[in-house]
Amino acid sequence: MNQEVMNLFNPQAPAQTFDSIRISIASPEKILSWSYGEIKKPETINYRTFKPERDGLFCARIFGPIKDYECLCGKYKRMKYKGIICEKCGVEVTLSRVRRERMGHIELAAPVAHIWFLKSLPSRIGTLLDMTLKDIERILYFENYIVTEPGLTSLKEHQLLSEEEYMIAVDEFGEDQFTALIGAEAIYELLASMELEKIAADLRVDLAETTSDLKQKKLMKRLKIVENFLESGNRPEWMIMKIVPVIPPDLRPLVPLDGGRFATSDLNDLYRRVINRNNRLKRLIELRAPGIIIRNEKRMLQEAVDALFDNGRRGRVITGANKRPLKSLSDMLKGKQGRFRQNLLGKRVDYSGRSVIVTGPELKLHQCGLPKKMALELFKPFIYARLDAKGYSSTVKQAKKLVEKERPEVWDILDEVIREHPVLLNRAPTLHRLGIQAFEPTLIEGKAIQLHPLVCTAFNADFDGDQMAVHVPLSLEAQLEARVLMMSTNNILHPANGAPIIVPSQDMVLGLYYLSIVAEKEPGEGMIFADMGELQHALENKVVTLHTKIKGRFKTVDAEGNPVLKIYDTTPGRMIMGELLPKNVNVPFDICNQEMTKKNISKMIDHVYRHCGQKETVIFCDRIMQLGFAHACRAGISFGKDDMVIPESKAKIVAETEALTTEYEQQYNDGLITQGEKYNKVVDAWGKATDKITEEMMARLKAVEFDPVTGRQKQMNSVYMMSHSGARGSVNQMRQLGGMRGLMAKPSGEIIETPIISNFKEGLTVNEYFNSTHGARKGLADTALKTANSGYLTRRLVDVAQDAIISEVDCGAEIGLTMQPIVDAGQIVASIGQRVLGRTALDPILHPVTGEVIVEAGRMIEEKDVEIIEKAGIQSIRIRSALTCETRNGVCAKCYGRDLARGTPVNQGEAVGVIAAQSIGEPGTQLTMRTFHLGGTAQVVDSSYLEASYEGTVKLRNRNVVRNSDGNLVVMGRNMAVLILDATGKERAVHRVTYGSRLFVDEGDTVKRGQRIAEWDPYTRPIMTEVEGYVEFEDLVDGLSVSETADESTGITKRVVIDWRSTPRGSDLKPAMVIKDKAGKILKLSKGGDARFLLSVESILSVEPGAHVKAGDVIARLPMESAKTKDITGGLPRVAELFEARRPKDHAIIAEIDGTVRFGRDYKNKRRIIIEPNDDTIEPVEYLIPKGKPFHLQDGDVIEKGEYILDGNPAPHDILAIKGVEALASYLVNEIQEVYRLQGVLINDKHIEVIVRQMLQKVEITESGDTGYIPGDHVDRIELEEINERLIEEGKKPGSGNPVLLGITKASLQTPSFISAASFQETTRVLTEAAVAGKMDTLQGLKENVIVGRLIPAGTGGMTNQIRRIATARDELIIDERRKTSGSAEANAMLVDMTNNAAE
């Protein structure tokens, strides 16, 4: 009540409405206009009275009163004197909170450079003056003079003079003949005297004339800054400060602690230093002190101001009393604890609580159990209001008492208040939007929150002590959003891949699986049941068991809703489950008449959701959960020692493998294979042995046994049931328990040759245990490190994609991407159907045989279409993609396609960028947290053969094969592929075969599925001859380019090419083998070059000089890297590397044109390769390749654009430049997907495409035309297109540019919004740049709006903003009408009125 009366006297000014925020450099006049007075003394408060000192840092006269409506001396108190200035102490009588907004200033006795513009790279002052930072610092810190006006002397303008040189010049020319200044005054003069228009014109002329790249870059940088100053209206001399602003005292408080000490903000210390030094300098100047003393004081003042703005940027960090660096103004903004991230983007929430969670299996999906104590505390305001309304209390105080005493009527009211008032539950870490969901609370006893088991997957929660936070949505709008958008019943599908996320797991799966098992020879086999009643009766009387094979009549409905009866071969367990299925024509009994593994249950729920809608699905899920729990409990499936079966054949397999390894050891001792080859073979052999033992073990576990007495089937192995159903445990874990643990990895990632032969059931020997500790510990260490890495990746992704919002329905783009199935090692890992589901077709999709239209252009591809597409065997489809979308701000709904979390076309306003970022980032954390589940056991990944994945006829593309001396077909081509065609001649599979592979089929052969097509040695790469003849060595000089290395352990020698460039004598050698005929003439290759084979470092020679070789024989081998284990460790950094668009370390070199390979003159230790184009209009392209890199092209080879000259991972920038956007997109999508696929994580392609779109938004200007840009500028792609359209209309010359790929960090920092960029990273740099350019932030993205405290322009906030815009436009129209009819005074009054309404 009192507050309301106060508000009458103290009306709040309506909040300003604004559409944009501008940042620029403050001029001295501006700083003075903010200030309420000058601070002259360094004192803070009086130590006895605790009142602020006059003219000090907390002065009440300048900043306002300490107590509301009370002057400092106490003469004026109370509201009635509001606005009076006390004549005794000079304090205005007003609210004390003005101390949070009133600023002061310090007038400096000498100008000081602003450290941000000086030291933040690139130095703005340096670039503008075209001087190096070192020189400027020399002037600023009083080491050198600078000549500003040489007059008629021999000195040059801007020449630096040391103290001595200055003295000599003064003696020589006289003091008034020239002007040389020192310190910040000098820089001030230089900046003030700059004529920016003239400089800009000169720079443009220079730019046009210069040819050197380096100079051009430098001129462009300078021109850019000059233009920034011209456009923004900033003056260069404002970068030198004569007045320092002082921030309001309540933002740098001084708090008395008990014991008479004070806690103070570091800023006060820093300000104190500035004031002290400034006052001392003033006094010294008044006293006319010697120049050297004044200079020293000026330098100290400069350092003090530097420390205030950015402590530690230059020189030593200034520390406080406790040796801790003081936090300067910059540090207040920077980093996780800075203003942006701590207070503006992350705020504390009232009306919230947290507690431990326990499982609530009897809850409905939309409910959660809330402890009464918590509910009472959280809903207090609502309870008070209700008590008041019902007349139980007349004041808040009374209501408070009632609630504190917990009177019975309070509990009744709590029940009323809580009814249908959703609360939000959140579990940290909130990695995706399903980490916060709304539930309806039900009151429970106890102190733990109850959580529905089905939502655990979404929260990634378990009940081993996890805690969750509860938040209460207060306003009606918030409650509405919570219910309609965030209710757990609305989040059935996973936003990352569109699969159900409300899926039973663990016990529930086990129970349902147990229900669906079929057993042989059970009692009552073959009985027929008419309905569920009969069946229940039979079950209760043990006539049949849950697993008996029976015939049952099942009741469903047809399309009209009439009941239909049908008889199925099934089991009673499955009938019980079928009872729960929603009655719908599209949900047949067959869907649960199968083994219910976790996969099948997920499919069933998905099917129900697609055909019966959300409500039915939710009811079905709840029922199926209860059924699962009940039967898991009934079944009593447990885990016993004897459930882990060790296969009898284990000893035999181990003995065989040990014999093999001994044989390899012998071969190595005889010198037939190298150390590396032996290692690879041993590791391979043990890997195969482990797999074999695992297979035998699984076969034993799976085996069905019968009881000899009753003849009934024995109970299945319970551990096998757990694993096979998907409830818990994997084959890998079972292998370690009952098979053999297998190979282990060292912390470096290499595999240890000796495996762990024991399993956990037998127990490990001491040595084995020691070997296994590596992996286990590395797993734990990795987990801790990677969680942070993955979180950082998510943060960068969110930042780059935050402004990708669905902003229109259709952009009308006529370009898109081509989708094809992804084939890996002959296996289809992602079918075309999976990839195009939920996307919009770009062109009509036609049936290849009948030619009828399956999907029209512009229609979304649904599940039913996918079935037809898969059956028809269509191999490539053009679809629309966010990547090629032409919407200006955001993405259009057509290009995006289906909203995966809803299963419908995406709505306008959906923040697809953030969803994409969360979908990619969330599993990153999952994966990293899951590295150690393998217990460090190694997985060897290397294939050495190729099997047909389909039946069909073989066709060889780019056929190039020869028969070698063993009579095998050997592949000689670099880009040869084996195609398998079906009966209609359609390609069913394409397999690339590597150079040197042995082929078992030839053109026209027919193959069966699983037949071997080719094999190769995965550990070495062969160098083969194409012609028959005699070998001769060239430049293979012992000790220089070739060394006989004797193996330490065997004494056998092998000849290896060594790095010949390390000695001066060998620098000109080109080690090679030549094939000659009998007469000693060098033979020619088919392509016309000589038969000379250049050898790289580490090649092992396989033939002796003079040996006779046939085509296809191996003359040398190059060892490959030994097999490393694959783990997401390679994964997360790999994903980050791809998103950051970094050039890989040894990146591939890609041919830019089609042509013929020629070898040029070598350059130092690089090999020069020239591609002569087939088209004479193009220039030849040169590449320099380090010698000693394994390089497989020969002189005269024909090469296609985009082929690899040097193997390795390609740099994404090269793909973009050479093959274009679509190839880049498919490369990035496939590479990133491969990492996730390896871990079994499904992410829809469109999420990755959205991020890649954000990385490809800029073009680099190559031809500026009349656009006003400078070549080399990065400009928004769509912005450039718009400017060009306008220029063409006006008949001017348009500009052109090449698309550039920016890494996600770079792209985030280059957003048009400086607020968003500053809150992301490198805050000082972003703000400095923005201030110089006088940037305007139009508040388009999400972050900017959160920071200024508005609704975000996405989702419901986007609609609200739109409505507000429409309303404002309407108001303006009405006012215009009024203006025309009546006077302007009335219209203005109306405008004020409307503004106030809007503000309220």
Curated annotation (Swiss-Prot):
EC number: 2.7.7.6
Pfam families in UniProt: RNA_pol_Rpb1_1 (PF04997), RNA_pol_Rpb1_2 (PF00623), RNA_pol_Rpb1_3 (PF04983), RNA_pol_Rpb1_4 (PF05000), RNA_pol_Rpb1_5 (PF04998)
Positions of Zn(2+) 1 binding: 71, 73, 86, 89
Class of this enzyme: transferase
Molecular function terms from GO: DNA binding; DNA-directed RNA polymerase activity; magnesium ion binding; zinc ion binding
Chaperone listed as a keyword: no
GO cellular component, one term: DNA-directed RNA polymerase complex
Matching HAMAP family: RNApol_bact_RpoC
Protein name (database record): DNA-directed RNA polymerase subunit beta'
Gene from which the chain derives: rpoC
